Regions:
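Structured adenosyl-cofactor binding patch, chiefly the S-adenosyl-L-methionine
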Residues: 131, 171-173, 187-201, 266-303
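Active-site/ligand-binding-proximal alpha/beta "capping" segment
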Residues: 231-284
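Boundary-proximal intrinsically disordered activation/regulatory segments immediately upstream
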Residues: 16, 28-94, 184
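RNA substrate-binding interface of SAM-dependent RNA methyltransferases
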Residues: 30, 109-111, 136-238
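Short, aromatic/basic amphipathic alpha-helical patches
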Residues: 95-106, 268
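A glycine-rich helix N-cap at a beta->alpha junction
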Residues: 105-122
Length: 303
């Protein structure tokens, strides 16, 4: 929040935005702040805070995440997410970042030359603009599952690239919602948001349970109680092919995908209603979880 003196709280830190804003027509515009000191504490949100610090588990109402590129930031704004501060190369203010800047209103806009921002962030801002945004209130998985027919469940998927790719495939290929066990990577991790291309703001998602001990039991029981049959994606001798007609005919199906490398736990596989395999050729024994998810989502989508 910004008070009358222009101070802004970002992830628990207090930042100064100059106490004034510019106006373009009747619209209030961000106060442009030239970066001359890379150690300014208000820049920590963009470069020095860890993902855990941004998330702020102890005070989730103060949590922040970073969105990159005009496309991704625009999707977040479309979904109602609150912008807190912008960081962009000076030349983009009237270029690729102009539309986003106009939408964000009176928030701090930090800017500098490419070399300055590269030293600050550790990489070039090839996507033009970063936006620090307020994390939303966590949703209950029951709320997310209301009225759905197909949901994806990620078990202990810790790689941010995979989480982002799975969410993107889910949004594109007919999945209604994504659920994550408590040990999964945060979907609002910077890389996960980037890889998802903003689809994390378009498809509902939630954690199923608050503690790792709540999965697979009672987590799977909760899904069954909501009317879902559960399908564990795993290569087992007793598995059914992903093309099984009975599987596709299920009115409500939860597609359960396991962590990188080891896949689903034996207990999860045993407790699911189905064990499902993707037939392979040329001696290939498995697919990356993100690739497997895309195949499963398309084949098992509600018809």
């Amino acid at each position: 929040m910004k008070n009358e003196k222009g101070w802004l709280s970002l992830g628990g830190k207090t930042c100064y935005n100059g106490g004034r804003e510019q106006e373009r027509g009747n619209a209030k515009m961000p106060q442009i702040i030239e970066i001359t000191d890379l150690s300014r504490p208000e820049l920590d949100v963009f470069c020095r805070l860890t993902e855990a610090q941004l998330r702020n588990r102890l005070e989730p109402e103060k949590g922040v995440f970073i969105a990159e590129s005009p496309t991704v930031i625009g999707l977040a704004l479309d979904a109602g997410y609150e912008p807190l501060a912008l960081l962009t190369e000076r030349k983009f203010i009237e270029g690729k970042a102009a539309g986003i800047i106009a939408r964000c209103g009176e928030i701090p806009l930090y800017t500098g030359e490419r070399e300055v921002l590269a030293r600050l962030t550790g990489y070039e801002l090839t996507r033009g603009v970063l936006c620090a945004m307020r994390r939303p209130r966590p949703k209950d998985f029951r709320e997310v599952c209301a009225g759905t027919r197909r949901v994806a469940v990620l078990e202990n998927v810790v790689d941010s690239t995979n989480v982002g790719a799975i969410i993107r495939s889910a949004a594109a290929l007919g999945i209604d919602a994504v659920l994550l066990t408590p040990s999964c990577c945060d979907p609002l991790n910077r890389r996960a948001v980037r890889v998802s291309m903003g689809t994390v703001f378009q498809i509902p998602w939630a954690y199923i349970g608050e503690q790792p001990a709540e999965w697979p039991s009672p987590g799977l029981d909760w899904l069954n109680g909501l009317g879902f049959k559960t399908a564990a994606m795993a290569l087992r001798e007793d598995s059914v092919s992903i093309g099984d007609e009975g599987l596709a005919a299920e009115p409500k199906l939860a597609i359960v995908l396991g962590t990188e490398g080891t896949g689903l736990t034996a207990r999860t596989i045993a407790d699911c209603d189905y064990t499902v395999r993707i037939p392979m050729q040329h001696g290939v024994d498995s697919l990356n979880v993100a690739a497997a998810s895309a195949v499963a989502f398309w084949q098992l989508r509600a018809k």
